[in-house]
Amino acid sequence: MPDRTKEEQQAKSGELKDEEKEEAKAGQKRKTPPASKAEKPPKKEPRQGARASARSAGKLGSGATVTSKQMLNFLLSKDALEYCYPADELEAAHSGKFSKNYSLTPPSLFTPFEHLVTAHLLSKPLSHVLGMRSVRTLLNPPYGYSTPEEMKKAGEDKIYQALEQAKTQHRQKTAAYLFEMAELYAGDLSKDASSASHGGDSDTMLDLAEAANDGGPRATISHLKSTVKGLGDIGGQIFCRRVQACDGWGEAIWPYADSKAMDALREVGIKIADADELQEMIEQDVDWDKVGDMGLVREKEGVDEQDYDVQVAVEFVTVLERALGAVLEDKVGQLKKAAAEWT
């Protein structure tokens, strides 16, 4: 398995393309997490069956072609997993021992704080496999640092121990950064545990939510850079990419796609201009009969049980991260060949 460098080693730090600079319309300014959309358009039924697409096709060396629509559907299917993630990550995710993992847990089931932890780890100079293993180790038993309160209570030494078990590089510095972040986001532990159960509704998390409401992804990234030690542009972009699938946060950030993820999407053969076009493509071109549950492991069975907006958001994040994974795993060619042969 190739030992690929992490996202920030392949991205131009600090750069946001035009589509990333477009800020989502903020809701009313308030010191609460971004509220779910008060008024939603009529619920759309998932599109089924084939639909003609004018989007460009990517040519393969064998003479076969794969259209953007076909690649989109293939990436969202369970058949694409082996080309997007390391084998040991998928084996661990399928084992049933880990309720939270990067590859198979829908991003809508992560809390905002868990997305912060994930962004912190994936933005470090680690290999693809080490980054995901670190996320899995920290967020599941015997550690289970899913809230800032739990991480703060554990202390820096325990965080270091978890990172050592994951065989993570730069353990000491990363443990220190994560502990400081937990201290920053932890609520008042003398109060009831309700805030902890929601991923840390502390004043600091509310400040982050307010930044998202006021200025969209750009303001969110700027706020994180100025308040969370060790988290830069790339970490902020990863956070925005993932947290938009969480209930309430999409109002301020959706739809957001960072430049690295968009580049990966184009590299695998999905030729789109921006995040808005990706959203439109998902809403119009996904064949639900073929995609099914996307191979994701859910607490509640069945993609049709979810709110339509959540479904689209999960697919949006999933297709971006699977495209990134194929690039990082150096399996773009294999992915394209499999997509062309997929029926």
Residue map of PLM features:
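Alpha-helical ds-nucleic-acid-binding substructure associated with the helix-hairpin-helix region
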Residues: 143-229, 241-246
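A general alpha-helix detector
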Residues: 116-120, 134-137, 158, 162, ...
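Short alpha-helix boundary/capping elements
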Residues: 124-126, 130, 142-143, 186, ...
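C-terminal accessory module of base-excision DNA glycosylases/AP lyases that mediates lesion recognition
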Residues: 2-102, 217-227, 233-343
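Alpha-helix N-cap/helix-initiation sites
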Residues: 110, 127-132, 171-175, 233, ...
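Short, hydrophobic/amphipathic alpha-helical patches that form generic packing surfaces
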Residues: 114-124, 180, 317-328
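Structural motif
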Residues: 103-115, 166-174, 306-318
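Extended cationic-aromatic binding surfaces that line active-site or macromolecule-binding grooves
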Residues: 109-141
